[in-house]
């Protein structure tokens, strides 16, 4: 029976084969016609690569079927050189977790009454949780830049 082999260049080769011929035999016939070594050939039929040990009938290749010939690629990507660093890697900063850190903002007197050591900002954009810095004669918010001046009886 006659089959066709289409190469990458678009050239079509006709081969006389039998259904019992192996893929190796077909590759040998292609080598005779084109001069391409069988170890570099890959034959594809119906989207599947044909394995050397099997026959044409295993793949249901009938008369006037077309096989596609592609060449096997050797090797892989270009190897990259490993970078050599002259200085050791920087150690990342680890944040230290302080247990009960919120206690810095409050003081408990001998009667058990809780006093806030810092004042929360009353600005519109700050809200609860933003504390003001204690200066000598005032409280100052670093976020919204508002300032509250102490009265004589209001000093901490």
Swiss-Prot record:
The record marks 68 as: Essential for function. Keywords: Cytoplasm, Isopeptide bond, Metal-binding, Nucleus, Ribonucleoprotein, Ribosomal protein, Ubl conjugation, Zinc, Zinc-finger. One of its GO terms (molecular function) is zinc ion binding. There is a cross-link at residue 76 (Glycyl lysine isopeptide (Gly-Lys) (interchain with K-? in acceptor proteins)). There is a cross-link at residue 48 (Glycyl lysine isopeptide (Lys-Gly) (interchain with G-Cter in ubiquitin)). Signal peptide: none annotated. A zinc finger (C4-type) spans 121-144. One of its GO terms (cellular component) is ribonucleoprotein complex. Residues 1-76 form the Ubiquitin-like domain. GO terms for biological process: translation. It comes from the Eukaryota. The record marks 54, 72 as: Interacts with activating enzyme. The keyword Lipid metabolism does not apply. Ubiquitin is synthesized as a polyubiquitin precursor with exact head to tail repeats, the number of repeats differs between species. In some species there is a final amino-acid after the last repeat. Some ubiquitin genes contain a single copy of ubiquitin fused to a ribosomal protein (either eL40 or eS31). In the N-terminal section; belongs to the ubiquitin family. This is Ubiquitin-ribosomal protein eS31 fusion protein. The lineage of its organism: Eukaryota, Metazoa, Ecdysozoa, Arthropoda, Hexapoda.
